[in-house]
């Protein structure tokens, strides 16, 4: 017998002694003396850092922060020199890094290099003093360096510099280095194909790589300070209670205005505003975690390989989707909170988002006319809008992500998003910053080129632009009274910015900024 629609609803009986049904078919934690089945911190190995001593020079004392990282027990330094370098180049580095070996690359110039078919080959010797402990043969296609030079948008790099970078990358790849620290002119350049094989960074840029390593391995020790006294050695550690709090501290170092805004809300005892700001901060942390997982997945790819594995593409794609969903949740939540703060008693429609230009047109521009932040906010809103268009595709269908060739030679492929199957509206600034190019799908012989965006670059640039957008918007509304909102919450415009800025950040803040610096 059917229940009539106008029947009184039955009040559910909710047990107070715990749930009466549970899913229990999963392994539980064992005693603490036994390892967990699925540990938060997976089995890991040290970060292997190659050092290009020809460009760094003989004095490690010039690189105090770099040495601090190299002396960590989770880092394995490899000292790399060329056969014609000064014999004493590595001596001081061996002492500070507490290693006994150096790796000698038997390469001087192209004319004297041996050949193996189309490849240039050279040896790398592991030396302890004058004793050779082992030797390996490495190869690189120097013609690729010539093609890179021909295709490059600028002519500021000599072919010999490109070939030397190729030799260094081939040696590093053979030795198992994760990253090479160098001051060579090819460091970090997209038009140098060998940066797809082994990442090269400046001494300062090793810190973000190391910070990502710490977060992905669950290592909470952000710094170690050693002191040696008579008969003893002391190591002091800077270690937050959890990886989650490490993210919170690191992101707060990048979002100073948002951090201050929360303090203002706490002082005003605006509980709802504090909760809204905390929600924004939590979503930023989760977006950052998703970004880190995108980069971690891409660490399984290499420019020597023909194509990334299907599992790697899936892992990176899922993490990128998650990042976009959290970024849009940030813009939506902050936009709605801002409208409520403009008129707390209105009770009107609050479904507005900071990703929308219309929100800036209708609510920001009229309340902050002539504000110096508006021009930059408009530029950053384009990045937020790109996030929303990618999010829309995620909701409608699967975001098309796959592998595409990203050089005019060879068969190596990069993971990229096929923007041709989305509605992302590209500006020249987005093209330049998101790593966009025209590519033909590798499995489509007669296919038409499509517009794609390199997933690592897109993930990093959208995230960093979003952080700047949120922090700049926070500065605007915290330090400026809205002119057309007579009933605005006290929170808006509560702080007077007199222009003072500390000349230098606190050392701890500076350290976290280095470890959480995803882009330059």
Q: What is each PLM-predicted segment?
A:
Residues 2-50, 54-68, 72-73, 85-278, ...:
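Acidic, Ser/Thr/Gly/Pro-rich intrinsically disordered interaction regions
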Residues 269-323:
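A long, hydrophobic alpha-helical segment
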Residues 75-78:
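Small/aliphatic-rich secondary-structure junction motif
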């Amino acid at each position: 017998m059917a229940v009539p629609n106008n029947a009184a609803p039955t009040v559910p009986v909710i047990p107070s002694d715990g749930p009466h049904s549970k899913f229990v078919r999963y392994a539980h934690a064992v005693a603490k003396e036994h390892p967990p089945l699925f540990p938060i911190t997976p089995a890991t190995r040290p970060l292997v850092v190659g050092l290009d001593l020809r460009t760094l020079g003989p004095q490690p004392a010039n690189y105090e922060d770099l040495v601090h990282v190299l002396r960590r027990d989770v880092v394995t330094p490899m000292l790399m020199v060329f056969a014609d370098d000064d014999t004493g180049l590595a001596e001081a580095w061996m002492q500070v890094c507490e290693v006994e070996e150096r790796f000698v690359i038997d390469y001087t110039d192209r004319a004297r290099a041996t050949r193996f078919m189309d490849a240039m080959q050279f040896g790398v010797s592991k030396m302890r003093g004058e004793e050779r402990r082992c030797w390996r043969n490495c190869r690189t296609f120097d013609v690729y360096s010539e093609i890179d030079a021909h295709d490059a948008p600028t002519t500021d790099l000599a072919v010999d510099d490109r070939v030397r970078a190729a030799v260094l990358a081939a040696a590093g790849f053979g030795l198992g280095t994760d990253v090479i620290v160098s001051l060579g002119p090819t460091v970090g350049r997209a038009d140098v194909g060998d940066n797809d094989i082994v990442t090269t960074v400046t001494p300062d840029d090793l810190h973000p790589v190391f910070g990502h390593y710490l977060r992905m391995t669950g290592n909470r020790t952000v710094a170690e300070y050693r002191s040696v006294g008579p008969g003893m050695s002391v190591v002091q550690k800077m270690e937050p209670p959890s990886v989650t709090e490490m993210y919170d501290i690191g992101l707060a170092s990048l979002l100073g205005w948002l951090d201050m805004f929360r303090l203002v809300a706490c002082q005003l005892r605006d509980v709802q505003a504090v909760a809204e700001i905390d929600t924004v901060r939590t979503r930023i942390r989760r977006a950052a975690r998703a970004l880190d997982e995108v980069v971690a997945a891409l660490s399984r790819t290499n420019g020597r390989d023909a194509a990334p594995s299907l599992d790697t593409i899936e892992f990176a794609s899922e993490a990128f989707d998650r990042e976009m969903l959290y970024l849009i949740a940030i813009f939506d939540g902050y936009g709605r909170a801002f409208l409520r703060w403009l008129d707390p008693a209105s009770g009107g429609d609050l479904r507005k988002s900071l990703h929308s230009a219309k929100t800036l047109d209708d609510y920001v521009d009229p309340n902050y006319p002539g504000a110096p932040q508006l021009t930059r906010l408009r530029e950053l809103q384009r990045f937020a809008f790109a996030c929303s268009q990618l999010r829309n595709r995620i909701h409608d269908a699967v975001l098309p992500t796959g592998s595409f060739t990203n050089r005019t030679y060879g068969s190596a492929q990069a993971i990229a998003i096929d923007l041709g199957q989305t509605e992302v509206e590209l500006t020249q600034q987005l093209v330049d910053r998101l790593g966009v190019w025209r590519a033909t799908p590798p499995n489509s012989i007669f296919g038409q080129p499509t517009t794609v965006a390199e997933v690592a670059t897109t993930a990093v640039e959208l995230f960093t632009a979003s952080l700047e957008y949120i922090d700049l918007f926070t500065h605007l509304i915290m330090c400026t009274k809205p002119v057309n909102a007579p009933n605005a919450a006290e929170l808006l415009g509560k702080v007077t910015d007199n222009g003072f800025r500390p000349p230098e950040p606190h050392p701890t803040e500076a350290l976290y900024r280095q470890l959480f610096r995803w882009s330059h």
